């Protein structure tokens, strides 16, 4: 999901903000690529600049223009794919495939048709597994630390930049 208006950040195109030298959306797609058969990126008029990445650097990513707000765009995306479907926001620069794999295993065993990933300290992060297009939901709580940082404010972005700097200082590059 990459269609948000980023009102808390003055309307910046968040998916294109760089963290560790590359746009956040590139980092997210790179980390989920091996977990998904098909990746669809839903964008909006506000975030239409991400289309340039869909045509090249992100590889086999289908870009679809959303129809409005988050709920409408989510419905659009879910109608384009077979289920189960994993929904991931474009503004989680450190998303970890190991955490996602653990979440998916737990979510698939959960009886509810919609399962949300919730970080123990940050709360809901916007990652959801849809086994059906609607219905009751459950939460899977994990302690993801910085790997589940969801950039919603400039303060979050500054934290991401700090984390990246700290990672580089110790000589460990994420990815």
Residue ranges of predicted features:
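N-terminal glycine-rich phosphate-binding loop and ensuing alpha1 helix
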Residues: 1-48, 98-101
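Short, structured coil segments at secondary-structure junctions
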Residues: 12, 35, 57-59, 81
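Conserved beta-strand termini and adjacent loop/short-helix elements that scaffold enzyme active sites
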Residues: 42-44, 64-67, 117, 141-143
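Acidic helix N-cap motif at the loop->helix transition within catalytic regions
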Residues: 48-54
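Conserved beta-loop-beta/alpha segment of the NTase-like Rossmann-fold superfamily
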Residues: 51, 59-125
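Conserved core of the sugar-phosphate nucleotidyltransferase
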Residues: 93-175
């Amino acid at each position: 999901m990459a269609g948000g208006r980023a009102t808390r950040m003055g309307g910046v195109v968040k998916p294109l903000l760089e963290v560790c030298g590359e746009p956040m959306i590139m980092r997210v797609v790179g980390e989920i690529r091996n977990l998904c058969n098909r990746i669809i990126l839903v964008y909006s008029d506000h975030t239409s600049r991400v289309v340039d990445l869909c045509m090249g650097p992100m590889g086999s990513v289908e870009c679809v223009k959303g129809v409005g707000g988050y709920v409408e765009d989510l419905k659009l995306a879910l109608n384009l794919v077979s289920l189960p479907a994993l929904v991931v926001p474009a503004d989680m620069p450190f998303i970890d495939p190991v955490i996602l794999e653990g979440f998916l295993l737990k979510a698939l065993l959960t009886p509810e048709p919609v399962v949300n990933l919730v970080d123990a300290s940050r709360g809901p992060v916007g990652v959801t597994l849809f086994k059906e297009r609607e219905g009751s939901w459950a939460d899977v709580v994990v302690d993801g630390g910085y790997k589940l940082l969801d950039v919603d404010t400039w303060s979050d972005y500054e934290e991401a930049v700090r984390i990246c700097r700290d990672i580089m200082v110790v000589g460990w590059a994420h990815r």
